[in-house]
Amino acid sequence: MTTILVSLANLLVVSLLVGAMFGIWLGYNPVNFPPTAYLEQQQHAIRALNVTMPILGKIGTLLTVASAVLARDDRLACALLIAAVVCSLVAGLVTRFRNQPINAKVMTWSVQTMPTNWTTLRDDWWKWHITRTLAGIVGLSLLIVGTLVERR
C-alpha cells in the first residue's frame, strides 16, 4: 500500500508541475508581446508561480527518489525512476540558475525602467524555459514508465 500511495502522490505532483510548465510553453510565448504586455504578464506569472513551482519541484523530486528506493528490487523500474530524478534535477537547476535570476531582474522593472536589452533577457528566459520544460516532460515520461513497469 505504501508503494501505491507514494506512486500516486508522485505522479500527481510531477504531473501538476510539468503540466504548468507545458501550459506556459504552449500559451505564453512572449516573443510578440509589446514591452508593457510582456512586463505585466511576466511579473504576474512570477508572483503567481515563483514559490509554488519550486515547492512542487522539490516535493516531486523527493517522491521520485522515494519511488526509486521502493522499487530497488526491480532493476528496470529503479533505473527509470533514477533517470526521472536526474531530469527533475536538471529542470530544477535550470530554473534556479537560469530562469530565476532573470525573474529577479524583471521584478525590479517598471515600464519606464525596462533596460534596452529587455528582449535579450526575455529570449534567454524563454530558451531556458523550453529547456526545463523538455527536461520535465522527459522526466515525467520516465516516471510514468518506471511506475508502470514496477506494477507488472
For each predicted feature, which ranges?
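Core segments of transmembrane alpha-helices
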Residues: 54-67, 132-141
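Interfacial loop at the N-terminal end of multi-pass membrane proteins
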Residues: 3-7, 13-59, 105-123
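Juxtamembrane boundary at the C-terminal end of a transmembrane helix
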Residues: 146-152
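Alpha-helical transmembrane segments of polytopic integral membrane proteins
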Residues: 25, 99-100
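Mid-bilayer segments of alpha-helical transmembrane spans in multi-pass integral membrane proteins
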Residues: 89-97
